[in-house]
A protein has these predicted regions:
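Substrate-binding/catalytic lobe of Class I Rossmann-like enzymes that use SAM or dcSAM, i.e.
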Residues: 176, 183-230
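Conserved SAM-binding loop of SAM-dependent methyltransferases across substrates and taxa
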Residues: 65-86
Length: 230
């Protein structure tokens, strides 16, 4: 509990966090269930719109202890004890430089044989996209709760676009707090409004070509407590 409390306090204060073994364990206990659930909602949206193929290649940037990975696995293969499904194939690549990769390695060891996973113990800035067995593009690029950890998230996301399939999806997911929400909107607008073919289709679909919102992307402010009448 002490580790988790310190972790949350440092995060909310904007302080640097050392991702050692203790922090990784804290993340697994505290954050994994929430990240597992969050990815499921997004994958459901992609499926409803026909944007999630049965067989897909995935890059999970800042994969952490495996919340998004497990959510993706169970969404594709189901939450059953059957670990030999006959349909679907996921070529999953995780980029994780911290001690969380050790936890992730154990988590991925319990997945289906058709969930073929590779852990790249590297920062995304140093990651070599074409160093693997194939240089096929990715169908899904996941930036789950990691953009706020990057020195230049816009440059990183822009670089990843060249490794995305023409009909692929980049998923940017951040915690619902003020700083990360505002930064996420800034990244989104820099990418979609730049010299790329990237478009935004969820959760705020762009309806008019060349037009984009200019608000800060945060609508919740803390106000003084309401005085309850006697």
């Amino acid at each position: 509990r002490s580790t988790i409390r310190t972790l949350k306090a440092d995060y909310l204060a904007g302080d640097d966090i050392e991702y050692d073994a203790a922090t990784a364990a804290g993340y697994a206990i505290y954050h994994l269930p929430a990240y597992y659930a969050a990815i499921g909602y997004v994958l459901a949206t992609l499926t409803e719109r026909g944007l999630l193929p049965a067989s897909l290649r995935v890059l999970d940037v800042g994969a952490g202890v495996g919340g998004p990975a497990l959510g993706l696995h169970d969404f594709v293969f189901g939450e059953t004890d059957d670990r030999e499904p006959t349909a679907g194939l996921v070529d999953y690549h995780a980029v994780e430089p911290s001690a969380a990769a050790d936890v992730l390695d154990r988590v991925l060891g319990e997945t289906s044989r058709n969930f073929r996973s590779t852990i790249h113990r590297s920062t995304i800035e140093a990651f070599e996209y074409d160093a693997g067995d194939t240089d096929d593009p990715f169908d899904l690029l996941i930036f789950g709760n990691v953009c706020n950890e990057l020195d230049d998230p816009v440059a990183v996301v822009e670089d990843s676009l060249s490794h995305l399939a023409d009909d692929g999806t980049i998923l940017l997911l951040e915690p619902a707090d003020r700083n990360t929400a505002i930064e996420l909107r800034e990244i989104e607008r820099a990418i979609a409004g730049g010299d790329t073919d990237a478009t935004v289709y969820a959760p705020t679909l762009r309806l008019w070509d060349g037009a984009e919102p200019d608000d800060r992307g945060w609508s919740f402010d803390v106000r003084p407590e309401i005085a309850v009448p006697a």
